[in-house]
């Protein structure tokens, strides 16, 4: 059985901002740090029109979540601020999400939010408040290596969130703290119960926070009207099979909902936004040997030009790591080559690179896929 005293940041008494979402994880972090004698300041971000989601269960950053965060702060007796980040969130996350779908990609808004809002902007705010550190409820670990802070997976594989934090910079990592990285979710809930927090049994968020009903297509059509223009569905062998209802309705690897009859199962293999074409083919057509990633954030020692490094990579948060070989292509691109072919590599998703439990870096999957 773990003890609260065993979970500490290794820091002297400090002023620490805690990013409080209203869920059990960040609430437990705030309570833990407060008990350890730190000067804790809670901050909750209002990221979108939460009126859309009031009363919606299992959605992050809804009106109920803001209320829950404030109630936890009141119970602990710590200052708590709600910051209006709606405009920043729309520009950095929602607009990016919509544009990514219109470009035939499969976006990952949680990573964009962590990068552009929760870390970049919130760290700036925490510094302005005079805080020494920013703590979050993410299930990852920060380990001090020979060359500075390193990002590592959470000890509980079922809750590890390192895939979503690959854009964290070295400078940000030095300022951040992740007290839950060595715990399981059950241990976190027990910790919250120990502190008497009402959110101890609150369900985890499941939906994309700004899509409380799960209907992302309605959000896209609201922001970009007439975005569901129909077009051709073409077999990878070159013949036309039918008509699609708009490329926003399709993603790489999709099988259901194609609306076409054929003598074998067909999958979405490629999406061409320029010519508004959805390409389909047999499952074997999904096999990928190599691809290019862009906007690489690298957290390890620099890779030399023409150097090849054998690593493990994840191309979806729910998939296990696969062995691959990476090489540098200029300042912000890399080539990733699987040792064994992988299926359904989707542009717009993240490719996160690991050496054991350490996150070396990552980037965004481009259409340069072979």
Swiss-Prot record:
Coiled coil: none annotated. The keyword Disulfide bond applies. One of its GO terms (cellular component) is cytoplasm. It is an enzyme of class 2 (transferase). CDD domains: MnmA_TRMU-like. The record marks 138, 349 as: Interaction with tRNA. Keywords: ATP-binding, Cytoplasm, Disulfide bond, Nucleotide-binding, RNA-binding, Transferase, tRNA processing, tRNA-binding. This is tRNA-specific 2-thiouridylase MnmA. Belongs to the MnmA/TRMU family. GO terms for biological process: tRNA wobble position uridine thiolation. Catalyzes the 2-thiolation of uridine at the wobble position (U34) of tRNA, leading to the formation of s(2)U34. The active site is at residues 113, 209. It catalyses: S-sulfanyl-L-cysteinyl-[protein] + uridine(34) in tRNA + AH2 + ATP = 2-thiouridine(34) in tRNA + L-cysteinyl-[protein] + A + AMP + diphosphate + H(+). Its EC number is 2.8.1.13. It is found in: Cytoplasm. ATP binds at residues 19-26, 45, 137.
